[in-house]
Amino acid sequence: MALQSLPCRHGSPTIRLTADTPIVPDSERLPLKRDEPGSRSMRSTFIPSSQCSNLSSATASSSRRRSCRRYQHGEAVASSSTRWRTKWNLFIICLLLLCLPGLAVRYMHDMFSPCISGVANSQHSSSQSPRSHCRSLVPSFIAIYSASVVLCALISCFLDPYETTLPLTNVTNCLTLFRSSGSLRSEHRCSTSDSRRSRQQLSITSRGSA
């Protein structure tokens, strides 16, 4: 059978057609339907094979940008109100994290105070063991921890439960979208390899038939 090669648009690879393949001219094609009277008409566009690889990555990057950035029109008030709430949350976390360093500084000060004050004071404090120091620090630790818990409870009473969460949702969304984009890229690689194999098989069969 005779083969006819027709070049495609935008520099895509040629398509081989047989003599029996009907070719419909542009004048006999049906007009395209429109969605709405005020919208643009749906036109058929030819996407080359070289741009298919960039399509999935572009859609994934645009979705990551939309998920990571804040909305400017619909939720502008909500985004501005959550800023000071996240500041309160960070303040609470810093308060909880600063309890242990404060206790450690106090313990180290009690241990190294003999070296600073002198020998007489060191003889007085030598009778105290490290266990006694730890026992003296336990009530202060309990008092600081209970005060921080009460402060967290008071602040959480004035906040919404949805807005008291830390701003980690955007990070998790970005990670999930990044993983999905990686899966899309792997699927596209598999599809391109399958298309290459099918093209090779078609070329082999066309050569054998010729």
From Swiss-Prot:
It is an enzyme of class 3 (hydrolase). Residues 49-58 have a biased composition (Low complexity). Residues 26-58 are annotated as: Disordered. Its EC number is 3.1.1.74. Keywords: Hydrolase, Serine esterase. GO terms for molecular function: cutinase activity. It catalyses: cutin + H2O = cutin monomers. Residues 26-38 have a biased composition (Basic and acidic residues). This is Putative cutinase.
